[in-house]
From Swiss-Prot:
It catalyses: 7-chloro-L-tryptophan + O2 = 3-(7-chloroindol-3-yl)-2-iminopropanoate + H2O2; L-tryptophan + O2 = 2-iminio-3-(indol-3-yl)propanoate + H2O2. Homodimer. It comes from Lentzea aerocolonigenes (Lechevalieria aerocolonigenes). Residues 1-21 form the signal peptide. The gene is rebO. Pfam families: Amino_oxidase. Its cofactor is FAD. Involved in the biosynthesis of the indolocarbazole antitumor agent rebeccamycin. It generates the imine form of 7-chloroindole 3-pyruvate (7Cl-IPA) from 7-chloro-L-tryptophan (7Cl-Trp), with concomitant two-electron reduction of O(2) to H(2)O(2). The enzyme is also active with L-tryptophan as substrate. This is Flavin-dependent L-tryptophan oxidase RebO.
Amino acid sequence: MSRGHKKITVLGAGVAGLVAAHELEELGHEVEVLEGSDRLGGRVHTHRFGEGGSVPFVELGAMRIPTKHRHTIDYIGKLGLTPKLKEFKTLFSDDGAYHTTSAGFVRVRDAAKVLVDEFRLLMSGRDLREETILFGAWLTAVGDAIAPADFRAALRTDFTADLLEVVDRIDLDPFLVGAARDQFDLHAFFAAHPEVRTSCTGKLNRFVDDILDETSPRLLRLEGGMDQLVDALVERIRGDIRTGHEVSAIDVREDHVAVTVHNGHGVNTLRSDHVLCTIPFSVLRNLRLTGLSTDKLEIIHDVKYWSATKVAFRCREPFWERDGINGGASFGGGRIRQTYYPPVEGDPTRGAVLLASYTMGDDADVLGGMPEAQRHEVVLDEVGRMHPELHEPGMVVEAVSRAWGEDRWSNGAGVTRWGKDVAACEEERDRAARPEGRLYFAGEHCSSTTAWIDGAVESALAAVRAIEAGDGR
């Protein structure tokens, strides 16, 4: 039961803003949503190659949901989308996919020998069991596939600490998998031995979460596109949702919040009783902000974002199936990093989509900083070395890409807290989410699960509770 009718302005129509708007309306409040861009959904961006329900599509933004992300799973259920949840096949899930090594591209099922040889060379001089070497080889392989450039060297440095010595004292036999027992089930291992996490030093400690999440066998997608989550929310919101309304200034006063908005017809300053800001801090820090505490301004400027760039090709056909790949992803290395093979949905005569390159961090900035045509050419050249079928006449019908680090509405793909311990992460979350008078905050940057949809939903629900309780300063 609401503690009284309130008029609330929500800034930003990403998942956090839309969830909050819907929840606030259900509590009886009057809500309007202002979005600077001409598109709803924020970093959920399903690109469709044409019009109609049967056209191929690709997720240029969020594309997967871990089953443990209960905020998202529960909300999908609330919106009636649970039947659409299907398995998301990721890196290392299809043993026919490729992995780049010093010996070139090898199938995942054949990669163990090369990976072990590479890791043994890295660990030369250390007396470790063969099973421990196998553990280290596969953890390094996953880290290489997922970690941005500035992180990969740190992974190897952390292996020189105590981690492998701890692992070397554990019975690893139950975690050897594959026909030749030359693959290692990292998920089962860390689940069975959580104490090993305390041996991870530096950046590796935080990154293990991402390693396990991004290669988890328990990842889901929305059949038909992730934008169905956005569409379902928009359909349920009764208040105005205005696109093309760009915020340039926020001024927090004792009894209201003044928001300066550019809407294409001029500049207006809106006076709102309560404002919920879901604008990423990477964008918010460039606005004119007054009336906020020194601590809030500091955290707005200090939160670190990482980039992500995706390049996709609509192909004449899913040629990778002829090559024995039935989904999942390959690690191509170089500038392309990860290549995904989404399921073919819709009319197969319209082709199939290859997510040719998914990069993060510094790797994403390299591709993201290129003109679009050059970016597509570079990716075609590098992925073509792994999949020469791409160079067949007429195989690539069209290309599309999104560089989130260059996107003026996000200035990054998500917040990173790698290298921070649990206490530091919680302190950052608390400072980011803390309201300033009648100005409240939500978004993945205000959550305990940054860079995921779950963080957006979690923070939106928390902000709604704070608005209801009147927790503003």
